[in-house]
Amino acid sequence: MPRAPRTYSKTYSTPKRPYESSRLDAELKLAGEFGLKNKREIYRISFQLSKIRRAARDLLTRDEKDPKRLFEGNALIRRLVRVGVLSEDKKKLDYVLALKVEDFLERRLQTQVYKLGLAKSVHHARVLITQRHIAVGKQIVNIPSFMVRLDSEKHIDFAPTSPFGGARPGRVARRNAARKAEASGEAAEEAEDEE
């Protein structure tokens, strides 16, 4: 049976003015602070944020007792609280408009791994994640931009299959251990020969 073609939608939008120096400096600072690979990661989050803010603005124009505003507004706020972008004491649509890109970047797995002290830097955190050393609960996650929910935050740890999580050491560590054992074995033989 023929399958319908899948339509893809754009996940980011580039800035209208490509060489605005103040924006370029701000993006570079963000990319360095959160260990991002490229500017597209910033554009993707700002695109998501703009869609969320647009929805909040649309709902704020409606009457407070409007069923659509009540239903969709609560759903939007609940989703943002679950991800941890919006705090429990700020459950109003006005606070949704005050959200910044940094609030979303804070919730990335890469940032959370660094904040929990599992990595020496945000860049090291990215390497650990892409090399499948990090698990959220029982699931290995190898996507640095994975959005960590509030209830999943306490389950971030090294994967059970990772050498950092107590599994079999890596290839280089095994080779070094074998060399060390071989060297200590030779030293013991030489000591026996001298006696």
Curated annotation (Swiss-Prot):
CDD domains: S4. GO terms for cellular component: 90S preribosome; cytosol; cytosolic small ribosomal subunit; nucleolus; small-subunit processome. The keyword RNA-binding applies. Residues 107-181 form the S4 RNA-binding domain. It is found in: Cytoplasm; Nucleus, Nucleolus. PROSITE patterns: RIBOSOMAL_S4, S4. There is a cross-link at residue 180 (Glycyl lysine isopeptide (Lys-Gly) (interchain with G-Cter in ubiquitin)). GO terms for biological process: maturation of SSU-rRNA from tricistronic rRNA transcript (SSU-rRNA, 5.8S rRNA, LSU-rRNA); positive regulation of translational fidelity; ribosomal small subunit biogenesis; translation. GO terms for molecular function: rRNA binding; structural constituent of ribosome. It holds the Pfam family Ribosomal_S4. Residues 161-195 are annotated as: Disordered. The modification Phosphoserine is found at residue 184. Keywords: Cytoplasm, Isopeptide bond, Nucleus, Phosphoprotein, Ribonucleoprotein, Ribosomal protein, Ribosome biogenesis, RNA-binding, rRNA processing, rRNA-binding, Ubl conjugation. PANTHER family: 30S 40S RIBOSOMAL PROTEIN, 40S RIBOSOMAL PROTEIN S9. Present with 63300 molecules/cell in log phase SD medium. NCBIfam families: PRK04051.1 (NF003139), uS4_arch (TIGR01018). Component of the ribosome, a large ribonucleoprotein complex responsible for the synthesis of proteins in the cell. The small ribosomal subunit (SSU) binds messenger RNAs (mRNAs) and translates the encoded message by selecting cognate aminoacyl-transfer RNA (tRNA) molecules. The large subunit (LSU) contains the ribosomal catalytic site termed the peptidyl transferase center (PTC), which catalyzes the formation of peptide bonds, thereby polymerizing the amino acids delivered by tRNAs into a polypeptide chain. Component of the small ribosomal subunit (SSU). Mature yeast ribosomes consist of a small (40S) and a large (60S) subunit. The 40S small subunit contains 1 molecule of ribosomal RNA (18S rRNA) and 33 different proteins (encoded by 57 genes). The large 60S subunit contains 3 rRNA molecules (25S, 5.8S and 5S rRNA) and 46 different proteins (encoded by 81 genes). Interacts with snoRNA U3. uS11 interacts with MPP10. Component of the ribosomal small subunit (SSU) processome composed of at least 40 protein subunits and snoRNA U3. Belongs to the universal ribosomal protein uS4 family. This is Small ribosomal subunit protein uS4B. It comes from Saccharomyces cerevisiae (strain ATCC 204508 / S288c).
